Amino acid sequence: MAQPAVAWFEVTGKDGPKLQKFYSDLFNWQVQDAGDGSGYGLVQAAPKGIGGGIGPAQDGGPGAVTFYVEVDNPADYLAKAEKLGGKTIVPPTEIPNFGLTFAFFADPEGHVVGLSKGAVQ
């Protein structure tokens, strides 16, 4: 099995459009609407780097900065994280229209990390 790599980043918060403008102005990132009505914006990967997303927090909370590690089986990695002292936050969740499955776990100190399988752009 290949070593899993960081494949995606996400910045969410109370004001998704304001965050999109901030990061667009700061880094000259082109943020494209995801097209699903969520207010989420997609950032294409630069020649050196990874793509990501910026938008509103789903629960209306303060948001977070998260990175996602691309893996072949999110459920297996959640189980492994739990054996190592982590905790599952969100079980594997499929987003069919994006061909993506994601999950979240917290490490032993509470840092939340995303897992992804599929079409991370």
Locate each region found by the language model:
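N-terminal beta-strand motif that seeds the catalytic metal site of vicinal oxygen chelate
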Residues: M1-Q20, P47-G49, A64-F67, S116-Q121
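Vicinal oxygen chelate
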Residues: A2-A7, V11, Q32, L78-A79, ...
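Catalytic core of tubulin tyrosine ligase-like
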Residues: Y23
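Conserved short beta-strand elements that form part of the metal-binding/catalytic scaffold
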Residues: W29-G63, V112-K117
